């Protein structure tokens, strides 16, 4: 401990000012899009909406088409909105907590809980904690969610509302879920509760650098199981 304190003291004396924000692009990266700011574009969208105005509640059609193409999802199941997937997930959780579906808000339940894949993303944990949702961990393995651990947690706790995870290049350890793992995850959680939600934070969907495991788009896997309602994917 003394050695650590001494190291900390030395670093503190350097008066460093370092931005450690994760995922924040460098100015050189931002410069790549400078020309987009000066292009003259038609402000009227393909469906007649004036893009300079408020837009559409579920997003402009062009953005939804792009998102559907990236996700291999149906466009009528794709929403484009907000500045980040994190904000969309927060709004979804808040809506379920306060209002629920069919007038069944989570806030009325006794100790509503959520499963968190670990190691995981601290912002996921902070959102759940802020809503007062009890968190239970579920381990990761080389193929994705540790299904044995998942079954143990679902058997032990009666009021789990959903699970949150990063299915591709999982934070911070990098797991890429196999198709079999995702399919079994959906089957298990669907059997546990038909209103269970799997929040797949697909922040790294297109961020492959080295050779990476092939992963069938989650909407296609979920559709084949009749589990689209259980799978909420954010990018």
Language model region names:
Residues 1-72:
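N-terminal "arm"/small-domain region of PLP-dependent enzymes with the aminotransferase-like
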Residues 198-199:
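Residue-level marker for buried hydrophobic side chains located in beta-strands
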Residues 233-235:
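Conserved small/polar residues in nucleotide/adenosyl-binding loops
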């Amino acid at each position: 401990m003394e050695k650590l304190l001494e190291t900390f003291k030395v670093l503190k004396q350097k008066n460093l000012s370092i931005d450690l924000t994760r995922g924040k692009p460098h100015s050189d990266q931002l410069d790549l899009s400078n020309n987009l700011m000066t292009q003259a574009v038609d402000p009227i969208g393909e469906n007649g909406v004036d893009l300079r105005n408020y837009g559409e509640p579920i997003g402009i059609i062009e953005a939804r088409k792009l998102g559907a193409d990236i996700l291999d999802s149906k466009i009528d199941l794709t929403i484009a909105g907000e500045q980040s997937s994190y904000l969309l997930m927060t709004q979804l959780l808040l809506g379920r907590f306060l209002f629920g579906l069919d007038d069944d808000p989570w806030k009325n339940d006794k100790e509503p809980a959520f499963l968190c894949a670990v190691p995981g993303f601290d912002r996921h944990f902070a959102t759940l904690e802020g809503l007062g949702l009890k968190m239970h961990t579920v381990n990761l393995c080389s193929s994705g969610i540790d299904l044995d651990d998942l079954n143990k947690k679902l058997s032990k706790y009666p009021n789990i509302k959903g699970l949150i995870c990063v299915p591709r290049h999982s934070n911070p350890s990098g797991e890429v879920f196999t198709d079999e793992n995702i399919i079994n995850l959906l089957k298990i959680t669907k059997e546990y509760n038909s209103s269970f939600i799997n929040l797949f934070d697909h922040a790294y969907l297109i961020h492959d650098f080295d050779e990476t495991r092939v992963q069938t788009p989650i909407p296609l896997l979920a559709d084949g199981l009749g589990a689209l309602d259980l799978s909420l994917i954010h990018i």
